[in-house]
Amino acid sequence: MRQILVAVTVALVVSILLTPALIRLFTRHGFGQEIREDGPPSHHNKRGTPSMGGVAIVAGIWAGYLGTHLAGLAFDGEGVSASGVLVLGLATALGGVGFLDDLIKIRRSRNLGLNKTAKTVGQITAAVLFGVLVLQFRNGAGLTPASADLSYVREIATVTLAPALFVLFCMVIVSAWSNAVNFTDGLDGLAAGSMAMVTAAYVLITFWQYRNACVTAPGLGCYNVRDPLDLTLIAAATVGACIGFLWWNAAPAKVFMGDTGSLALGGVIAGLSVTSRTEILAVVLGSLFVAEITSVVLQILAFRTTGRRVFRMAPFHHHFELAGWAETTVIIRFWLLTAIACGLGVVLFYGEWLATIGA
């Protein structure tokens, strides 16, 4: 528990202190956000708001994770794990793709950065490397950071993917989650606040896996997760980093996370879901992100097949704005829905454990 508190605190402090420094730096160099011309009229006054604040989020997560391990050395704590480094490596790689995208937008003074092909190639490259490496690094108990079995709350032994299919599966998961968080990041604080809740749920889930790991507590309901405590630290650090950033990103936002932050945070969800064996459960926890990307897909499909739109504008948080909802109303209501989804996900997780032990 002490390690979790250290991870949250260090990440929060780094994020909340680094963000205003970045705001001053980006403002001085004119690194401001460009706004879609076809977006809601109320968003036009946001043009020029400093972007790429996701740098503070990524830095906060790394600081929280590494700082906890450095502090742990004084108490005979374990070093970093393969699972932890791979999840953060994935998030950082995706954040790098987002950083290039943000930088190009700023340099060209338009809301279009990397072209779709270049952005997709970057995401797929990160996903392939993650998918290949996450099945390596077998520990003394014979566990790798991920399992080739499809998983809900734990592995579904009847659905085992061949290595090539598993890598393809990782490509889908990583691309889907990174784009989903990216689409959600359209209102002040929406993505950061929602992400804090999802990763808070993962703190509970992975810590429970740690307390009931088959390596240390074999028996009914135990979990074959390689490094559950390290995943808890990553989730906790993400909570702290998002809250620290939210202090400056809440409406009216003084800074945006940009693709730097949204793609990296999507990588955190993807990485945690794969390494904690909860790929399907993650869909429940992050159902807001799922709904946002689904609204974009539906909008595109409907327009291409019928010439009509399902929503006034996609992602669908803009639909409610154009319907007359105030931006803060949309944000708070979506946060409430995220909290409900996370609560439901934790209940499903715990309920599965109770059913497994026959309680």
Curated annotation (Swiss-Prot):
Keyword Transferase among UniProt keywords: yes
GO cellular component: plasma membrane
Chain segments annotated as transmembrane: 3-23, 55-75, 80-100, 117-137, 156-176, 187-207, 231-251, 255-275, 280-300, 334-354
Keyword vocabulary terms for this entry: Cell cycle, Cell division, Cell membrane, Cell shape, Cell wall biogenesis/degradation, Magnesium, Membrane, Metal-binding, Peptidoglycan synthesis, Transferase, Transmembrane, Transmembrane helix
Main localization, broad class: membrane
EC nos: 2.7.8.13
GO BP: cell division; cell wall organization; peptidoglycan biosynthetic process; regulation of cell shape
Statement: the UniProt record of this protein carries the keyword Nucleus: no
Domain of life: Bacteria
Subcellular location(s) of the protein: Cell membrane
Membrane-protein topology: Multi-pass membrane protein
Enzyme class: transferase
Name of the protein described by the UniProt record: Phospho-N-acetylmuramoyl-pentapeptide-transferase
Organism: Mycobacterium leprae (strain Br4923)
Lineage, opening ranks: Bacteria, Bacillati, Actinomycetota, Actinomycetes, Mycobacteriales
